[in-house]
Curated annotation (Swiss-Prot):
Pfam families: bZIP_1. Disruption phenotype: Mutants die soon after hatching and during all three larval stages with only 2% reaching the third instar larval stage and these die before metamorphosis. Altered expression levels of a number of genes in third instar larvae and chronic inflammation and starvation responses in the larval gut epithelium with a predominance of extremely large lipid droplets and obesity but not hyperglycemia. Belongs to the bZIP family. ATF subfamily. This is Activating transcription factor 3. One of its GO terms (cellular component) is nucleus.
Length: 613
């Protein structure tokens, strides 16, 4: 750092001058002047003693103005923690001002002036002060403690060749004189700085701690926001999944209903010649692209007449499923005696139960042929089967199966044939027509009539039917047919001989008069009320025909009929009218089956599935 060619006489002259002046301590300007004198390489070659003295005087005069700038340079150098602050200040000042003369070639005749040197010193001092302030303001302790040492260690290592002379000079100066007050103050400041730890100040540490806390809080908030967004997305996905499942179920249900409706339209028997022709828009499902996801089969496009022959049967439950209103009991009390069977359900009750009655027009379209020459009634109900949805009301007698039986009467060679061909898909009425003719001149006695009734009872008991007792067969005779006619005006004739077993609506000839061979055929014509006897209407030609018919349509028609045809006179008619009492049937029921005695029992009987057996 220092020039090795500097003669020792110059150093000695300064020291001796200082010693001869009576212990005068050199000031900072004097030190700078000596440094400038030492850094001049051409001092021994081209300058004379006078020029050197003049230069020294000019330096001394001008260095006073630079002392203020040189002093902080010394102070800044002491912040770096070197063991010898004064020698290092001289080192640093010399290094800052001796760069250009040493870098310049030795043959140059021009030397830097004192003003240039002072300006350079001031600039370097300002730079160092700014750098020191920046380093102190940083929060990183490692950078603040290592960077100054690295910089100044590089400078010191670059000038290791001149360190020995500087140490000798500093040692001679310390041995000769003590430092002045300024040097003592600067050394005190340096010692205080050295006593402080190399880490951060408390304020910096507090600031750094608060910054870390803020960073932690910000990071926590960021993580919480991300977690909240993730949870919201998860919840939204769950809601969408649930909605997707619900919508799929709704689409599946609607598609199933649509297919059912399309099938219903296809199965409908259209009256037009071309049949039922559905448009292509109805045949193609709106949810065609979702059928694969919904696991539904695609709807096959069939012909317009493909479903005409499809008939859907709908089973009818028992009468216990029908709900009657609050006034039903009173209405039944007015129509029927206690313990008797129920009337037919009304149209409202049918609609409430979800079933439809067959239209009267369809009933009239079904032809029936009646042969007047014989006693055979042929029921043709299979001519035009209806392709529409049918609701055949079947009474609670599902187990009743049998065939049409021919019951021989007590007269000569006369058969009471009852042919019933009922179909559950076509009609809910079985035409049970009973006609009885008397070709003999002998009179019919009540004993013969009662024997015929007993024969019918025995046939019912012996047949495969749920009516296993005579009492059940007797009640079966009073049950209406499957059309449920209103039996309000049906009468039960009391036996004039006191026979309680006569529970049929039969008319007995008691005057022994000769009967005619006139056969009065009563055609049902889909009306089950024709086989009941109404005394409020006029009689035709003195001939009265009564019949009791029971029909059950469960695929196989079963019919039982007993008829008596006798002429009457006015006295007998009056006797018959006066003899029809509503309490006779109740009295007979009390005698034979005493469990049906009041309205509550009849209601319980109705709720029990209307099964009489």
């Amino acid at each position: 750092m220092f020039n090795s060619n500097i003669p020792a006489s110059s150093l000695l002259s300064i020291d001796s001058g200082g010693l001869l002046m009576g212990g005068h301590t050199p000031k900072t300007p004097e030190i700078l002047n000596s440094l400038i004198a030492m850094t001049n390489p051409l001092e021994n070659f081209s300058y004379s003693s006078a020029a050197a003295a003049a230069a020294a005087v000019s330096v001394a005069s001008s260095s006073a103005s630079c002392s203020a700038a040189s002093t902080p340079v010394v102070t800044v150098r002491h912040f770096n923690g070197h063991p010898n602050g004064q020698s290092h200040s001289q080192d640093s000042s010399h290094s800052s001002c001796s760069g250009s003369p040493l870098d310049s070639p030795a043959g140059t005749a021009t030397t830097p002036s004192v003003q240039q040197t002072c300006s350079r010193l001031i600039k370097e001092g300002l730079k160092l002060s700014i750098q020191s302030k920046r380093k102190l303001s940083t929060c990183d302790s490692s950078s603040g403690s290592e960077q100054p040492h690295s910089k100044y260690s590089r400078r010191s290592s670059n000038h290791n060749g001149h360190s020995g002379s500087s140490n000798n000079y500093s040692g001679s100066m310390s041995n000769a004189n003590d430092l002045d007050d300024d040097c003592e103050e600067s050394s005190d400041d340096d010692s205080e700085t050295k006593s402080q730890p190399k880490g951060l100040t408390p304020e910096d540490e507090d600031r750094r701690r608060r910054r870390r806390e803020r960073n932690k809080i910000a990071a926590t908030k960021c993580r919480m926001k991300k977690r909240e967004r993730t949870q919201n997305l998860i919840k939204e996905s769950e809601v969408l999944d649930t909605q997707n499942v619900e919508l799929k179920n709704q689409v599946r249900q609607l598609e199933t209903e649509r297919q059912k409706l399309v099938d219903m339209l296809k199965s409908h028997g259209c009256q037009r010649a071309g049949g039922c022709q559905l448009p292509s828009q109805l045949l193609q499902s709106p949810a065609q692209k979702y059928l694969s996801e919904l696991e539904l089969e695609t709807v096959s496009i069939d012909g317009p007449n493909s479903g005409n022959n499809n008939q859907r049967l709908q089973s009818i439950p028992s009468m216990a499923t029908f709900k009657y209103g609050s006034k039903t009991a009173a209405a039944m009390a007015q129509q029927l005696p206690n313990g008797y069977c129920k009337p037919s359900p009304s149209a409202q009750e049918f609609e409430h139960a979800g079933y439809q009655q067959q239209q009267q027009q369809q009933q009239q379209q079904q032809p029936q042929s009646l042969n007047p020459a014989g006693n055979n009634v042929i029921d043709q109900q299979h001519a035009n089967p209806s392709p529409s949805l049918l609701s055949d009301y079947v009474p609670n007698c599902d187990g009743l199966t049998g065939s049409a039986s021919n019951h021989p009467s007590h007269n000569n060679n006369n058969n009471n044939n009852n042919s019933s061909g009922a179909s559950s898909n076509t009609s809910n009425n079985n035409s049970n027509i009973s006609s009885h003719s008397s070709n003999a001149t002998s009179s019919t006695t009540p004993t013969a009539t009662s024997s015929a009734i007993e024969f019918v009872k025995n046939e019912l008991v012996d047949s495969q039917s749920p009516y296993t007792t005579a009492l059940s067969a007797e009640r079966f005779l009073f049950e209406p047919s499957d059309g449920f006619p209103d039996i309000k005006h049906a009468c039960v004739l009391p036996s004039p001989c006191g026979i309680n077993g006569l529970n049929m609506a039969s008319v007995v000839n008691t005057n022994g008069s000769t009967g005619n061979n006139n056969n009065s055929h009563h055609n049902n014509n889909n009306n089950n009320n024709n086989h009941l006897m109404d005394f409020h209407q006029g009689l035709q030609h003195g001939n009265i025909g009564t019949g009791v018919g029971v029909g059950v349509g469960v695929g196989v028609g079963v019919g039982v009929g007993v008829g008596v045809m006798t002429p009457y006179d006015d006295e007998q008619l009056l006797l018959l009218k006066n003899g029809c009492f509503a309490t006779d049937l109740l009295s007979q029921l009390v005698e034979e089956g005493g469990e049906y005695v009041d309205l509550d029992s009849a209601t319980a009987f109705m709720n029990n599935g209307s099964c009489l057996a």
